[in-house]
Curated annotation (Swiss-Prot):
Residues 258-287 have a biased composition (Basic residues). One of the primary rRNA binding proteins. Required for association of the 30S and 50S subunits to form the 70S ribosome, for tRNA binding and peptide bond formation. It has been suggested to have peptidyltransferase activity; this is somewhat controversial. Makes several contacts with the 16S rRNA in the 70S ribosome. InterPro entries: NA-bd_OB-fold (IPR012340), Rib_uL2_dom2 (IPR014722), Ribosomal_uL2 (IPR002171), Ribosomal_uL2_bac/org-type (IPR005880), Ribosomal_uL2_C (IPR022669), Ribosomal_uL2_CS (IPR022671), Ribosomal_uL2_dom3 (IPR014726), Ribosomal_uL2_RNA-bd_dom (IPR022666). It comes from Prochlorococcus marinus (strain MIT 9303). The keyword Kinase does not apply. Part of the 50S ribosomal subunit. Forms a bridge to the 30S subunit in the 70S ribosome. This is Large ribosomal subunit protein uL2. SMART domains: Ribosomal_L2, Ribosomal_L2_C. GO terms for molecular function: rRNA binding; structural constituent of ribosome; transferase activity.
Length: 287
């Protein structure tokens, strides 16, 4: 999939970069795999805002995606590639030989009419789902299960993949997209290949209105608020923060604070921690 740039006819097209969607073949989603989804708009059950800067956006229908790939031994044909408004990755519509239809994450390089299958005896081909014990070392996988039978939970975003590093006993070592190396049970399933639509990381919205279409509301800097609204607020003119470092609206450290519990039981499965991103790459926005 290629990216498309625009001439600066308007301020919104000057920096606009989008994907050309030439992989998407189906215009309308499969009716049997679509459900209505209530949009919470960042509110909890009491109507209180628990996640700021959420609301509005285009109305969506949720596509039911098969993350388990539990139809073992039943071949399926790729009928179409569909757009999904809830994620950057595209969806592949599968027609199984027993008549059932399912959506899966579309792997990179998949083609219309290609035959896919899941199970421990499946061939080593892109799009097939196998247990980690049956996948060769060095292979790239996505939609990796963390617990057997629960469905894929890791490496699901567009262009992402995990790498099978080693096998020892009942566990397989995976290098995740975050560079973390983690042990996963060998009976957990994963799909061969990487998730498609990897060019989405090179896109640019170009204007604030396109962000509103996605359901993202404006984000106001804390330094321009009053001191009753944010710890960064107050002062005369453009005053500094007045603290040793930036904090959240609730007074907690905003950058560099570790949020993982020290004594979490699953820490023993993490062989190497992820590489910490710098403040420059994270973007130290005054929230």
């Amino acid at each position: 999939m290629a990216i498309r740039t625009f001439r600066p006819y308007t301020p919104g097209t000057r920096t606009r970069v989008v994907t050309d969607f030439n992989e998407v073949t189906g215009r309308k989603p499969e009716r049997s795999l679509v459900v209505a989804k209530h949009r919470r708009k960042g509110r909890n059950n009491r109507g209180v805002i628990t996640c700021r800067h959420r609301g509005g956006g285009h109305k969506r229908l949720y596509r039911i995606v098969d993350f388990r790939r539990n139809k073992h031994g039943i071949p399926a044909k790729v009928a179409a590639i569909h757009y999904d408004p809830h994620r950057n990755a595209h969806l592949a519509l599968l027609f199984y030989t027993d008549g059932e239809k399912r959506y899966i994450l579309a792997p990179n390089g998949i083609a219309i009419g290609q035959q896919l299958i899941s199970g421990p005896e499946s061939p080593i081909e892109t799009g097939n789902a196998l247990p980690l014990s049956a996948i060769p070392l060095g292979s790239s996988v996505h939609n990796v299960e963390l617990y057997a039978g629960r469905g894929g939970q890791m490496a699901r975003t567009a262009g992402s993949s995990a790498q099978v590093m080693a096998k020892e006993g009942d566990y397989v070592a995976l290098k995740l997209p975050s560079t973390e190396v983690r042990l996963v049970r060998h009976e957990c399933y994963a799909t061969l290949g990487e998730v498609g639509n990897s060019e989405v990381r090179n896109t640019s919205l170009g204007k604030a209105g396109r962000r509103r279409w996605l359901g993202r509301r404006p984000q106001v800097r804390g330094s321009v608020m009053n001191p009753c609204d944010h710890p960064h607020g107050g002062g005369e003119g453009r005053a500094p923060i007045g603290r040793s470092g930036p904090v959240t609206p609730w007074g907690k450290p905003a950058l560099g604070l570790k949020t993982r519990k020290r004594n979490k039981p699953s820490n023993r499965f993490v062989l190497r921690k992820r590489r910490r991103t710098s403040k420059r790459s994270r973007g130290g926005r005054d929230s």
